[in-house]
Curated annotation (Swiss-Prot):
Keyword terms: Chaperone, Cytoplasm, GTP-binding, Nickel insertion, Nucleotide-binding
Name of the protein in question: Urease accessory protein UreG
Originating species: Ectopseudomonas mendocina (strain ymp)
Primary location class: cytoplasm
Binding-site residues, GTP: G12, P13, V14, G15, S16, G17, K18, T19
Family to which the UniProt record says this protein belongs: Belongs to the SIMIBI class G3E GTPase family. UreG subfamily.
Gene Ontology CC annotation, any one: cytoplasm
SUPFAM superfamilies cross-referenced by the UniProt entry: P-loop containing nucleoside triphosphate hydrolases
HAMAP family associated with the record: UreG
GO MF annotation: an example: GTPase activity
Keyword S-adenosyl-L-methionine tagged: no
Subcellular location: Cytoplasm
Biological process terms in GO annotation: urea catabolic process
Superkingdom in the source lineage: Bacteria
Length: 204
């Protein structure tokens, strides 16, 4: 049991696969760790409901936050609504190992407040085109791990994974990234290994 839960922030544009990754992480880690999730949506609790429907965790371990307005404000400038959800989960489940905080769909400039997230994963998807990594922004350049998702779509949208890799290396330097396809679990083991290593997670 860890004294304070590791808080992992998952950000990225709308439709990049954040909720699918959150679901995959919950399914892979829930037997080994004491986990809870906070999701952010602007006007609904759709992502939270998706996770409940797909039985990611018990419903009481998932809190859906309705941010209203601009989604990245709730994870950065005024993270109070998310910090309160994290506290609520800590009270509800003493001894949590891991809390995943999934942001609402945001733009490339969104980042997590250090108060809210210990580690940040930023998810982009190949269907947005192979020029996306070179556009930069804090999510692409500064996240702890960049997840380039939906690699299976590359041939359909004419995107080059080689170009994406080259530009990602240029934009991120030695910061890690992983190619992923959550439909078949590609990249998931690497993402989990990164979270465990960097977050110093140890199973009970």
């Amino acid at each position: 049991m860890n004294s304070q839960p590791l808080r992992v922030g998952i950000g990225g544009p709308v439709g990049s696969g954040k909720t699918a990754l959150t679901l995959a992480l919950c399914r892979a880690l829930r037997e080994r760790y004491n986990i809870a999730v906070v999701t952010n949506d602007i006007y609904t609790q759709e992502d939270a409901q998706f996770l409940v429907r797909n039985e990611a965790l018990e419903p009481e371990r998932i809190i859906g936050v309705e941010t209203g307005g601009c989604p990245h404000t709730a994870i950065r400038e005024d993270a109070s609504i998310n910090l309160e959800a994290v506290e609520q989960l800590n009270r509800r489940f003493p001894g949590l190992d891991l809390i995943i905080v999934e942001s609402g769909g945001d733009n490339l400039s969104a980042t997590f407040s250090p108060e809210l997230s210990d580690l940040t994963l930023y998810v982009i998807d190949v269907s947005a085109g192979d020029k996306l990594p070179r556009k930069g922004g804090p999510g692409i350049c500064k996240s702890d791990l960049l997840v380039i998702n939906k690699v299976d779509l590359a041939p359909m949208v004419g995107a080059s994974l080689e170009v994406m890799e080259r530009d990602t290396l240029k934009m991120r330097g030695d910061k890690p990234f992983v190619f992923s396809n959550q439909k078949i679990g590609q990249g998931l083991d690497e993402i989990i290994a990164f979270i465990e290593r960097q977050g110093m997670l140890t199973a009970a």
